[in-house]
Amino acid sequence: QNDMGAYMAIFEIMAQHDLSLTVKFGVQFGLFGGAVSLLGSEKHHKKYVEAIGRGELLGCFAMTETGHGSNVKSLETTLTYDKTRKEIVVHSPNYEAGKEYIGNALHGTMAAVFGQLIVDGVSHGIHAVLVTLRDENHQLCPGVKVEDCGYKIGLNGIDNGRIWFDHVRVPLDNLLDKYGGIDENGVYYSPIANENRRFFTMLGALVGGRICVGAGALGASKVALDIATRYALKRRQFGPEAMEEQLIMDYPSHQARLLPRLVKPYIYHFALDNLRNAF
């Protein structure tokens, strides 16, 4: 808990064996779990964190949209508060507002959905709400549509999908309200008055996952270069008949291609270590 170094180490080691598993791990614990832990309040921690950690509650991180990519501030998904029923209505107003390339989309039972929080007709910017995707029989809940992204050229162990919401209602308590919530009178409140500052504070709480992506890439590159180096020290290449076969590592042309790449993981390792310490 709260140990970025340990989490990065897990990411790097997992990436040396199975990148699909690494991404699934990151989605479950880093993105979905991180959203609940870092954007939610104590009531969310008590209700969900242990189940997420045990893998009993599988979840998604539904931020990216088809029409907006990583332009989070322009997301079209709406989270509209219904005062009379004390519920939040989650809605995708069009195809482009669908959540795109979401990991765990085919297995997840809940999603942290990001969208524009609207109270009394006024948008208070991007917030996140927990939405149940599937019931106890793993059937999609009413108003939830999920579409598989299909075969990919890699990482096919990840169930990437698209998700749309058609006026799906969730309790007000499902709003992750650490940086902004709605009180019992239906009035919006936030410890950060400035919307832009609040937006960047929310996103900043999740930046640790970006560091872990680098750790995973580093782990994969170490394995690839280890294989390439060992192979170069065993594989022999024939030449003129009178000469003995030579190791391909003895060829200057092979050294020129391989050795600079062998140096880079050392550089990235120390750079990531420095970034972890700064974080």
Identify the residue ranges that each predicted region occupies:
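Extended amphipathic alpha-helical segments enriched in small hydrophobics
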Residues: 204-279
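A short core secondary-structure module
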Residues: 83-145, 162
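Sensory/regulatory domains in signal-transduction proteins
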Residues: 35, 65-70, 96-98
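Flexible, small-/acidic-enriched active-site or ligand-binding loops
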Residues: 141-167
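A glycine-rich, basic-preceded beta-loop-alpha segment at the flavin cofactor/substrate interface
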Residues: 101-104, 164-209, 229-250
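Internal helix-loop-helix
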Residues: 1-55, 107-110, 269-272
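A short, Trp-centered hydrophobic/proline-enriched beta-strand micro-motif
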Residues: 54-63
